[in-house]
A protein has these predicted regions:
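Short glycine-/aliphatic-rich beta-strand segments at the starts of folded cytosolic domains
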Residues: 1-11, 42-44
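Residue-level signal for pocket-adjacent positions within structured domains
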Residues: 8-9, 28-31, 61, 66
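Short Gly/Ser/Thr- and Asp/Glu-enriched loop/turn motifs at secondary-structure junctions
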Residues: 37-41
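Short, conserved charged micro-motifs
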Residues: 12-16, 49-56
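C-terminal structural segments of small proteins and small subunits
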Residues: 52-80
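Short amphipathic alpha-helix segments
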Residues: 12-28
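A short linear hydrophobic-aromatic micro-motif
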Residues: 29-34, 73
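Non-catalytic surface loops within mature trypsin-like serine protease
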Residues: 9-11, 48, 80
Length: 80
């Protein structure tokens, strides 16, 4: 199955990349943009047919490697 993990900074954590993108958009006269947040998306295939096991495995991957859970949140999507 295909796995999509979206990682983003937690609310309240300064997003310097988001601020830079926001500033760049404003300099291009996109003045109607606000609250820009930049994250990352990790996409991979997982050879697992049991959705519950897949979710447990990917959660562990996120907790151990893919996200810094002190400052980042993550969301997991399983696609059959």
């Amino acid at each position: 199955m295909k796995i999509v993990v979206n990682v983003s900074l937690k609310a309240g954590v300064l997003d310097s990349q988001g601020k830079a993108v926001h500033h760049a958009l404003e300099s291009l006269h996109f003045n109607n943009v606000s609250n820009v947040r930049v994250g990352k998306q990790i996409v991979f295939n997982l050879d697992e047919s049991d959705e519950k096991k897949a979710m447990a495995d990917v959660t562990r991957m996120c907790e151990d490697l893919l996200a810094n859970t002190v400052i980042e949140d993550y969301a997991i999507e399983l696609i059959k």
